[in-house]
Amino acid sequence: MSDLNYLYGAPLSKADFKTTAEDFMVDEDLGIEFTGSGEHVCLQVVKKGENTQYVAKLIAQRAGVSPRDVSYAGMKDRHGVCSQWFSVKVPIKKPIDFSDLNSESVFVVSQQRHERKLRTGCHKGNKFTITLRNVTDPLDILCRINAVRSGVPNYFGEQRFGRDGHNLVMAEKMFAGERIRDKKLRGIIISAARSHVFNQLVSLRVKEHGLAKTMHREVFMLSGSNAFFEDAISDENIARLASGDIMMSAPMVGKSEKGLTEQEKVWLGPYQSWCDGLGELGLKNERRMLRLIPQDFSVETIDESTLKLSFGLPKGCFATALLRELVDYTDASPRERKEKDSKDEDPIK
């Protein structure tokens, strides 16, 4: 993400991020009311220093099913203390106590019956609590807080692209004709390529227009929906933007240029080979909100070089997109585990 433009200029302060697991805490907001009956058991699990797939395998072993039969709303980072929900089909007549899985790194908080399994992306969002250590300029961070509260570019985080951008290297090879037989890996690479093009376009818009300034024509998304429409800027649309009824958006490139504004086509020019490669895959044109606005953002000063940040984000959004506008951070999580994570990376957050 170092090549992407900042909305508020490059931050002055440096800090360490994820020095300990407790420095990065995530609480998944599922937003689902369980039916209390049905063949699917939903489990709320807190994991520390483990990835989502590892916990899914534990649940599968306990239920006597394949890991493919365990579902979850989204992947969560290994390097932190993360609460998330899983589901697995368990016959009503054969109840299982999943608290047997409890250990130093995995704890089952809740177990609920539900009529349907959890699906990827079914959650509402995530609540983050992040501790920054060895902060060199706390005042600069505190001065940026109010600006960041109004929104930051909704960039995809670097974890989407694999270690050292390996997923993008693989994408270039795939577009050049190299076959990728592993279906899951192929999906990860396609997602990374699409996200890269999105980031580059948003970065150009930030540089030339910022996010507060609307263009003559915009493609708007309906809040809480993937539906979008192109329209000229009008008093009505400005009022709808202010109320949160609609949002400005940027393209997730698909099989045609339909839905792109003329300015977006210009910005995508340098990445035409990427757009062509994605288009040949037959992907449906989609949009993603342009501005990421944190919810319930608060900051606590622990000491002269330690700050604790708390905020909520919608599903699919990255805490690092917000963090980079506040501080020049260094990921202090263990290197050897980080290398393993790059192989396990999943497109959903």
Swiss-Prot record:
Responsible for synthesis of pseudouridine from uracil-13 in transfer RNAs. Keywords: Isomerase, tRNA processing. GO terms for biological process: tRNA pseudouridine synthesis. Its EC number is 5.4.99.27. This is tRNA pseudouridine synthase D. Pfam families: TruD. The active site is at D77. PROSITE patterns: TRUD. The keyword Zinc does not apply. It is an enzyme of class 5 (isomerase). The keyword Secreted does not apply. One of its GO terms (molecular function) is tRNA pseudouridine(13) synthase activity. One of its GO terms (cellular component) is cytosol. Residues 151-309 form the TRUD domain. It comes from Pseudoalteromonas translucida (strain TAC 125). It catalyses: uridine(13) in tRNA = pseudouridine(13) in tRNA. It comes from the Bacteria. InterPro entries: PsdUridine_synth_cat_dom_sf, PsdUridine_synth_TruD, PsdUridine_synth_TruD_insert, TruD_catalytic, TruD_insert_sf, TruD_pseudoU_synthase. Belongs to the pseudouridine synthase TruD family.
